[in-house]
Every structure is written in structure tokens, then in C-alpha cells.
Amino acid sequence: MRIMARIGVENSLTDVQQALKQQGHEVVTLNSEQDAQGCDCCVVTGQDSNMMGIADASIKGSVITAHGLTTDDICQQVESRT
């Protein structure tokens, strides 16, 4: 059985949060840079390219910018990066 990832998702992306939870991932709402720690991957809106410092080296995983992507696109990117 595959171990699901811990995914940080910006709080305005509620549809993405729900979709990732349905896939079995642990979803953490990103309210501050500390919330991103321990996440395998983070999903941000892209409205602020360095949202709360998350786009820098504060996390070990990838940062996915949701701008222009559908919820399905984002979920596929999460699957390919975790």
C-alpha cells in the first residue's frame, strides 16, 4: 500500500484541499511558513510568488503554483511529485 503524502495547501484553495483529502493525502492548511515544514509538497495560488516565504528553501518538497491549473491538474502534479 502506498503511503500518502503530507500536502500543504493555501487556505483559499478549498476545492484542492478536498480533492487531495479524498485521494487519502494528509492536507495541512498553509497559514504561515511554519505550516509548510514537514510537508512533502505545497500548493499555492501563485498570486504571491513567494507566499509567506514558502517558495524558498523552507520546505524539502516541491511548490506547485495553482494559477491556471484545474483541480485535477493540481492533483496529478501532486501525484507525480510525491
UniProtKB/Swiss-Prot annotation:
The lineage of its organism: Bacteria, Bacillati, Bacillota, Bacilli, Bacillales. This is UPF0180 protein BALH_1248. Coiled coil: none annotated. It comes from Bacillus thuringiensis (strain Al Hakam). Belongs to the UPF0180 family. It comes from the Bacteria. NCBIfam families: PRK03094.1. InterPro entries: UPF0180 (IPR005370). Pfam families: UPF0180.
